[in-house]
Amino acid sequence: MKQPTEQRFDYVKIGLASPDRIRQWGERTLPNGILVGEVTKPETINYRTLKPEMDGLFCERIFGPSKDWECWCGKYKRVRHRGIVCERCGVEVTESRVRRHRMGFIKLAAPVTHVWYLKGIPSYLSILLDMPLRDVEQIVYFNAYVVLDPGNSGNLQYKQLLTEDQWLEIEEQIYAEDSELYGIEVGIGAEAIERLLQELNLDEEAEKLREEIIESKGQKRAKLIKRLRVIDNFIATGSQPDWMVLTVIPVIPPDLRPMVQLDGGRFATSDLNDLYRRVINRNNRLSRLQEILAPEIIVRNEKRMLQEAVDALIDNGRRGRTVVGANNRPLKSLSDIIEGKQGRFRQNLLGKRVDYSGRSVIVVGPKLKIFQCGLPREMAIELFQPFVIHRLIKLGLVNNIKAAKKMIQRGDPQVWNVLEEVITGHPVLLNRAPTLHRLGIQAFEPILVEGRAIQLHPLVCPAFNADFDGDQMAVHVPLSLESQSEARLLMLACHNILSPATGRPIVAPSQDMVLGCYYLTSENPKAQKGAESYYSDLEDALMAYEQGLVDLHAYVWVRCDLEVVTEQPDDKPIKTETSEDGTVTKYYRHRKVRETADGKLICQFIHTTVGRIIYNKTVQDTLVA
């Protein structure tokens, strides 16, 4: 039985690929024994037949058929010929989706350096060779020679750079009749870099560096440590330094660099095809020049152009002039496809679109509890549709899924009742990008609301770093019982009061909440409607406010026979009055107390504002609940 994809490997590792590994990616042996995989022609499709050219960038023999179960020449059609390789065109009869993963390769006529390892920061080539980056660049781009073997010359040193004139002068001395010089070898271009890297013994270099590090200090020591770290990494991964010089280039599958026909008969193509075409053209031209034994200067110029073409393919604009297409637009290289927000990793691998998710603008929901969020009905019915359908069938309201979907589309009133049942106790996850810490995604109990905006409790905003000026948030529905229970126990907003970074409360009132509390409890000394009125209890005062008999900031007297706790340490009465019946009335700063002669409380009135009554009652009700 075939294993699931995730069980066929343990982990993904990014590293240097050897030339043999690159060949393995693209090379296949057909049943008739023919090896295919090498792309040798720059052509893409035939302009008359609109079929891919053989051995070109869209070759069906290398990458697989363009149409399902059909070979290039049309001899074999239909699925019954599965796995057969056409004896005429050599195309395997299989599904066209293999063109999404089958690769090819280009065998280079001359080695080229990988621009990432040359021009990256740090430059691994210059670190390993222990040469300045400028010198390595001059060698790679055919501006200077490097001594590979000084021979018996006393004036030359290993890895010494020579200009064109200096090398010509030494050549004259070597070939002179009375010359005693011999064994001198110099190189230029990526071939010379490859030779230097091949001669590097990593174990010996690492041992030598460790000894030097002990004796050195300061800047020199830091440089040696950096070099040792790179060498140790090469040894640990089993990679060879000369793999940074390419002799084979992989050609990515054609469906990842497509060519599509537009309405007017013209074709739109990926920039990669143009960059690959440049490499193949220059590579083929270099091969022909080498076959006809062209002058060294012409061959060298072609090698430099091949190096620049490969640089543009891997990372356009990293070095030299940027290759541009129509309208002077820089062509997108392999690096451009990988890197950045719209790149393959962040756009397609890390940030995939997922089912059972939605996105909308957030607005404040002041009437929500801290663990609740307002979910628009339109969004909720879409997200919870499978649960609603299951419930409708279970209740016997419909007989099958198709009927349930029609019922939902009609907006039947029963659907909304079922939806209410389904979402009860089913938490949803809210996420606000960028998710910089674990509180960037939290669980909430959904409450159905009208409109199209997600309602969020203002107290959870600091955790999400959200505000209500147009921010958007994503909603995800946990499907399995395990994920639902985990969301409820670990991710519910009311369980995330403290910041995991500092341990301090992250849920704190701010902005309009603080302003609202201030406005509610502030006093206004000007004449207010209903000021100095007497009310039998708190409810009586609130009822008067709702009827418009008293203003929010008006001072009123409210009867409250409970014990009053005050911040003032010695709360003594300002005035005391004794009535004819023997009762005593004590006047404090913010209250009046009437007691019997022996000190028993008869009644007590508090001097406060309606706003403070509302504030106090809200806090009390919350604490009791």
UniProtKB/Swiss-Prot annotation:
<feature type="binding site">
    <location>
        <position position="467"/>
    </location>
    <ligand>
        <name>Mg(2+)</name>
    </ligand>
</feature>
<dbReference type="Pfam" id="PF04983">
    <property type="entry name" value="RNA_pol_Rpb1_3"/>
</dbReference>
<dbReference type="InterPro" id="IPR034678">
    <property type="entry name" value="RNApol_RpoC1"/>
</dbReference>
<dbReference type="GO" id="GO:0003677">
    <property type="term" value="F:DNA binding"/>
</dbReference>
<dbReference type="Pfam" id="PF00623">
    <property type="entry name" value="RNA_pol_Rpb1_2"/>
</dbReference>
<dbReference type="InterPro" id="IPR007080">
    <property type="entry name" value="RNA_pol_Rpb1_1"/>
</dbReference>
<keyword id="KW-0804">Transcription</keyword>
<feature type="binding site">
    <location>
        <position position="71"/>
    </location>
    <ligand>
        <name>Zn(2+)</name>
    </ligand>
</feature>
<dbReference type="InterPro" id="IPR006592">
    <property type="entry name" value="RNA_pol_N"/>
</dbReference>
<keyword id="KW-0240">DNA-directed RNA polymerase</keyword>
<dbReference type="GO" id="GO:0006351">
    <property type="term" value="P:DNA-templated transcription"/>
</dbReference>
<dbReference type="GO" id="GO:0000428">
    <property type="term" value="C:DNA-directed RNA polymerase complex"/>
</dbReference>
<dbReference type="InterPro" id="IPR000722">
    <property type="entry name" value="RNA_pol_asu"/>
</dbReference>
<dbReference type="InterPro" id="IPR012755">
    <property type="entry name" value="DNA-dir_RpoC1_gamma"/>
</dbReference>
<feature type="binding site">
    <location>
        <position position="471"/>
    </location>
    <ligand>
        <name>Mg(2+)</name>
    </ligand>
</feature>
<keyword id="KW-0808">Transferase</keyword>
<dbReference type="InterPro" id="IPR007066">
    <property type="entry name" value="RNA_pol_Rpb1_3"/>
</dbReference>
<dbReference type="GO" id="GO:0003899">
    <property type="term" value="F:DNA-directed RNA polymerase activity"/>
</dbReference>
<feature type="binding site">
    <location>
        <position position="73"/>
    </location>
    <ligand>
        <name>Zn(2+)</name>
    </ligand>
</feature>
<dbReference type="GO" id="GO:0000287">
    <property type="term" value="F:magnesium ion binding"/>
</dbReference>
<comment type="similarity">
    <text>Belongs to the RNA polymerase beta' chain family. RpoC1 subfamily.</text>
</comment>
<dbReference type="GO" id="GO:0008270">
    <property type="term" value="F:zinc ion binding"/>
</dbReference>
<comment type="function">
    <text>DNA-dependent RNA polymerase catalyzes the transcription of DNA into RNA using the four ribonucleoside triphosphates as substrates.</text>
</comment>
<dbReference type="InterPro" id="IPR044893">
    <property type="entry name" value="RNA_pol_Rpb1_clamp_domain"/>
</dbReference>
<dbReference type="Pfam" id="PF04997">
    <property type="entry name" value="RNA_pol_Rpb1_1"/>
</dbReference>
<dbReference type="InterPro" id="IPR042102">
    <property type="entry name" value="RNA_pol_Rpb1_3_sf"/>
</dbReference>
<keyword id="KW-0548">Nucleotidyltransferase</keyword>
<keyword id="KW-0862">Zinc</keyword>
<feature type="binding site">
    <location>
        <position position="86"/>
    </location>
    <ligand>
        <name>Zn(2+)</name>
    </ligand>
</feature>
<comment type="subunit">
    <text>In cyanobacteria the RNAP catalytic core is composed of 2 alpha, 1 beta, 1 beta', 1 gamma and 1 omega subunit. When a sigma factor is associated with the core the holoenzyme is formed, which can initiate transcription.</text>
</comment>
<dbReference type="InterPro" id="IPR045867">
    <property type="entry name" value="DNA-dir_RpoC_beta_prime"/>
</dbReference>
<keyword id="KW-0460">Magnesium</keyword>
<feature type="binding site">
    <location>
        <position position="469"/>
    </location>
    <ligand>
        <name>Mg(2+)</name>
    </ligand>
</feature>
<protein>
    <recommendedName>
        <fullName>DNA-directed RNA polymerase subunit gamma</fullName>
        <ecNumber>2.7.7.6</ecNumber>
    </recommendedName>
</protein>
<feature type="binding site">
    <location>
        <position position="89"/>
    </location>
    <ligand>
        <name>Zn(2+)</name>
    </ligand>
</feature>
<keyword id="KW-0479">Metal-binding</keyword>
